[in-house]
Regions:
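Acidic, divalent-metal-binding catalytic cores of TOPRIM
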Residues: 1-310
Length: 310
C-alpha cells in the first residue's frame, strides 16, 4: 500500500480529478474568465506571456503531460463548447507530431529549451548583468556560450537519440535511474572555456549498457518503488534491445537533423546555470556576480529573457 507522505499528498493535488473539482468550483463563480492548464512548474514561463493578453485568468498546475491530456479529454466529453475559454499547454518531449490542434504543444522538448539559446543569453547579459552589446565582455561571453552550447548538444545527442529509439519501441526511459533527470553532472562538468567529460564513452551503446545495469541492480536488490516491477522492466528492455538498435541504425536521421528540438530541457537549463556560474567565478571569471540562481528559481529569474516562439 502506498504510504502517505508530503510528496504523495502534493502529487495528489495535481491529479486530474482534483483539478477538475477546482475548475468547476471556480467556473461557477467566474465563468467568463480564461482557465489555463499546464504541466507542473511551467507557469513560471507561461504566466507572464498570458498576462500580455489578459489579466482575468485562473491557472492550474496539472501533474504532467498525461494528466493534462486526461483533463482535456474530460472537457471534450462534456461538449466542444466547454473549450471556449480554456487553454491547454504541454511539452513536446519526444513527440514527433502534434497531439491535438486545440492543445498548445511546445515546438521543442520543453519550455526549458526556450531559456537556452543565443538570443536568450543576449537578453540575460543586457537585462540581468547590465552589459551593452558593444561592451567587450558581451562578445566574449556570447562567443563562449555559443561554443559550449554547441559542444553540450553534440556530447548528449546520442543520449537523446537512444531515448527516442527506446520510446519508438515502447520503452520509456527513467532518467532518474541514470542520475540524469535534471542535469548531466554525472557525465560532464561545465566550464565556460571548456566542457570536461567525466566518462570515457557517451555513445548510444554506453547509455544502453548503463540503463540495463541500473535495472538489473534494482531487480536483484528486490526493491520496489510504488509497486514498480524492475524485473519485468528489465526483461522488457532486453527483449526490445535489438529493435531499439535497429531503429537507431535506420530511422533516426530526421531526429538527428533537428536534435535541438528533442533535447531534454532540464539538462539544457542546468547547462545554462552552470555556464553562468562559471563566467561569474571569482577565480578566472568574466562577469561580476549579480544575483543568486539555483535549479528552483532559474526559470523565474530568467523568464522575461526566454524565447517566445510564434
Amino acid at each position: 500500500m502506498k504510504s502517505v507522505t508530503i510528496e504523495n499528498h502534493l502529487e495528489s493535488l495535481t491529479e486530474s480529478s482534483v483539478i477538475w473539482e477546482r475548475y468547476t468550483r471556480d467556473a461557477k463563480i467566474n465563468p467568463n474568465r480564461y482557465f489555463v492548464f499546464y504541466e507542473g512548474e511551467d507557469r513560471q514561463y507561461y504566466d507572464c506571456r498570458i498576462q500580455q493578453y489578459t489579466e482575468t485568468y485562473n491557472t492550474y498546475a496539472v501533474g504532467g503531460k498525461s494528466k493534462v491530456l486526461k483533463l482535456f479529454e474530460k472537457f471534450t466529453q462534456e461538449g466542444e463548447s466547454t473549450l471556449a475559454n480554456k487553454l491547454f499547454f504541454i511539452d513536446k518531449d519526444y513527440e514527433h507530431h502534434q497531439v491535438n490542434p486545440d492543445i498548445y504543444m511546445t515546438p521543442k522538448y520543453a519550455v526549458e529549451n526556450f531559456y537556452v539559446s543565443s538570443t536568450a543569453i543576449k537578453r540575460i547579459l543586457k537585462v540581468h548583468f547590465g552589459i551593452n552589446d558593444d561592451d567587450p565582455e558581451f562578445g566574449r561571453v556570447l562567443k563562449y556560450f555559443n561554443e559550449r552550447h554547441r559542444e553540450f548538444i553534440d556530447y548528449l545527442t546520442e543520449m537523446n537519440l537512444w531515448a527516442i529509439c527506446c520510446q519508438l519501441n515502447g520503452v520509456k526511459i527513467d532518467f532518474d535511474l541514470l542520475g540524469l533527470k535534471n542535469n548531466a553532472d554525472n557525465i560532464l562538468k561545465v566550464k565556460y572555456k571548456k566542457l570536461e567529460l567525466s566518462v570515457e564513452d557517451i555513445s548510444f551503446y554506453y547509455f544502453e549498457r548503463k540503463y540495463g545495469e541500473k535495472l538489473r541492480e534494482k531487480s536483484e536488490s528486490g526493491l520496489e518503488k510504488n509497486g514498480r516491477d524492475y524485473t519485468a522492466e528489465l526483461s522488457y528492455f532486453m527483449d526490445k534491445k535489438e529493435y531499439i538498435r535497429s531503429t537507431f541504425a535506420n530511422d533516426v536521421e530526421e531526429y538527428r537533423s533537428c536534435i535541438e528540438n528533442y533535447f531534454r530541457g532540464k539538462q539544457l537549463l542546468w547547462f545554462l546555470k552552470e555556464f553562468i556560474l562559471s563566467v561569474e567565478n571569482k577565480s578566472g571569471g568574466i562577469l561580476q556576480k549579480q544575483f543568486f540562481i539555483e535549479d528552483r528559481n532559474i526559470m523565474t529569474v530568467f523568464t522575461n529573457c526566454a524565447d517566445t516562439p510564434e
